[in-house]
């Protein structure tokens, strides 16, 4: 509830477009600065960097949980992931409060909320990040995965198409997430409508074929062909 109230209040803050730094990477900080000397922007960067360190730990535990077969170890890894996602969310929210124009922080507010199952709150944060930095690839990909979780298939497909034109690597990541979603829906007792799942599966296969056929046209594909 506090998260929703915080996001709702921050949406009212006027947005000034911000320049994009490396996605997900820690931000550089002034040397020899103390918390008393730091500007709100520097304090925001510090909170953001702390959040990045925490979210990376969460991701490692989350990835580990998918590989574990022992029930107790899996449960422990998931609990650790949850706790680190919650901790990092607090830090990213603090960063966004100190610097409402930091789209990187808003993107991670969305990411951590999505990992915690707060999909509607996550979407609001992604929208904030994209309002500050239109076309921001990381937010488009993360938002696409949130659309999947909410069964908003056409929105997830559009997110993929937007990424396909701008960032093939993240487009591939979203397509992989779609494949995982399809598998999970087919194995779930109360999954989505079978016709809709089959239609998405066909679409994913078609898009994967197109991606493979055009891989050499991208900068990364051209570089790979010369190795």
Question: Where would I find each of the regions flagged by the language model?
Answer:
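Canonical tetratricopeptide repeat
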Residues: 108, 142, 176-177
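Structural signature of tandem alpha-helical TPR/SEL1-like repeats
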Residues: 77-90, 115-128, 151-159
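Register position in tetratricopeptide repeats
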Residues: 56, 115, 149-150, 184
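Terminal, low-structured helical/coil segments at or just beyond the last alpha-helical repeat
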Residues: 24-35, 165-227
